[in-house]
Amino acid sequence: MGQKVNPILFRLPVNRQWRSIWYADKKTFPRFIWEDYQIRKFIKKRLESAAVAKIVIERAGNRVRINIHTARPGLVIGRRAAELDKIKEEIMEIVEKGREVLVDVKEVKHPELEAQLVAENIALQIERRVAYRRAIKRAMQLTMDAGAVGIKVRCAGRLGGAEIARAERYHEGKVPLHSLRADVDYGFAEAKTVAGKIGVKVWICRKEDIATVVG
């Protein structure tokens, strides 16, 4: 079970929280789901270079609060909060009229321990034509140096421009996917190369004391 399912979803009742925090009836539920998807899609595209680890959306009454967890808060906020105001205005066009939109920026203090950021970094290095093995091993070393218990990386596609697609796995330390108490983070990214897309999956097991800081 632990090998097949998404590690974050698998641990939701134990040591993970939902990234969409709200309740809705049957009529408004589809609208909220669509809005959340569009908001996340817009933020990830707009802040592609800002190292956004996750986006948490909270709804209460007519208020929509969006928490952006990023390793580069300065890029998100901008000079005199100009960039943040622009993001807020564009999000207001996505959500239903009459709703109050609040955008909070939270700094990620340990980007090397965020699986999504590690996966995106590896994918970016592959797109820049860095050898995939070198990119993966360097990312794994940085993660272990940051205090991780273990890391597992799976890279699949036409690796190195090969004619036949294949998958390779790299592992260091301990990543207990079946242990619900273990704080395992998961991330996925795609590298768009001349030969085609290369998928990168990353699992990171963090220490309990670090997990309380990272969230």
From Swiss-Prot:
Keywords (A to Z) from UniProt: Ribonucleoprotein, Ribosomal protein, RNA-binding, rRNA-binding
Record has rRNA-binding as a keyword: yes
Gene Ontology BP terms: translation
Pfam families found in the cross-reference section: KH_2, Ribosomal_S3_C
This protein's GO CC annotations: cytosolic small ribosomal subunit
Keyword DNA-binding among UniProt keywords: no
Domain KH type-2: 39-109
UniProt superkingdom: Bacteria
InterPro entries in UniProt: KH_dom, KH_dom-like_a/b, KH_dom_type_2, KH_sf_prok-type, Ribosomal_S3_C_sf, Ribosomal_uS3_bac-typ, Ribosomal_uS3_C, Ribosomal_uS3_CS
Disulfide bonds: none
Protein family per UniProt: Belongs to the universal ribosomal protein uS3 family.
Chain's role: Binds the lower part of the 30S subunit head. Binds mRNA in the 70S ribosome, positioning it for translation.
Subunit and partners: Part of the 30S ribosomal subunit. Forms a tight complex with proteins S10 and S14.
The protein, known as: Small ribosomal subunit protein uS3
Organism for this UniProt entry: Methylacidiphilum infernorum (isolate V4)
Gene from which the chain derives: rpsC
